[in-house]
């Protein structure tokens, strides 16, 4: 799979793009390409449009509720029973967006997910499971790390609750810090998968920086692209060894959490989610986790290949 960009769905041109007027999350360089792609696009466009209309209907009904939930119940939406049809409709809309697989559909799904977490701090629907991989697919690695760290902190016994969504607790956290926090009392297997992907992309970028001359276009992360001089001054060898240690710990943690995780991750045909209910450590848990995180891995195949080789050699 190609890394996501704002580009024509058909020819990948990035100039003078038009949006699909129905789903709003597919772009084309011309009306001709839009017409040419319609037979395929309508398979995904129509469900998105349908779920958007249903969401609009539920939002209109909820905004008319006498308890004024959008003003008075923010942060407690899932506990407020009348808001549940709206939250479920929003979740269905996000699911429909996931089938479109464009930059705009992922960005839209992320925006809706973050707003759902603002409305419902308890996250009774498990929206937080998918957010880091959405950040990663958009090239927003720092925000992915801040999100993972915030929820890892929240899940600790002394994590606390300041009334703000956990993903807002940290900003520009150090991606080179120890990973133990993210492994203790962890809440979702796929967050650990997403953190592993982030660390491997980071490692590959650091290794690329060692090459002379290096190709700026080969860098996978903005974390490295925006800090080249700083990272070189810090000493690349030490950073590389540190990140390798983090990767080793994460791989060990993932295997201990679920022994099926590598079988599913390295065999895409086996990663289809079969159920929303599963027991910890089961094959179904691994399938659900990989189903959520795999698009981000598929758009970073160098990282997937590196992890597979690392796991097989260790």
Place the predicted regions along the sequence by residue.
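Long C-terminal extensions of eukaryotic subunits of large macromolecular complexes
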Residues: 1-7, 12-17, 32, 221-314
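Acidic/polar, low-complexity linker and loop regions
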Residues: 1-6, 82-116
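Internal amphipathic alpha-helical repeat/solenoid segments
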Residues: 2-14, 53-81
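Cys/His-coordinated zinc-finger cores
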Residues: 20-45
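Helix-turn-helix repeat elements of alpha-solenoid scaffolds
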Residues: 47-71, 99-111, 139
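Acidic, polar low-complexity intrinsically disordered regions
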Residues: 64-68, 84-86, 103, 119-120, ...
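Alpha-helical repeat scaffolds
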Residues: 67-75, 104-115, 141-152, 210-258
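Amphipathic alpha-helical repeat scaffolds of TPR domains
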Residues: 79-99, 121-137, 161-212
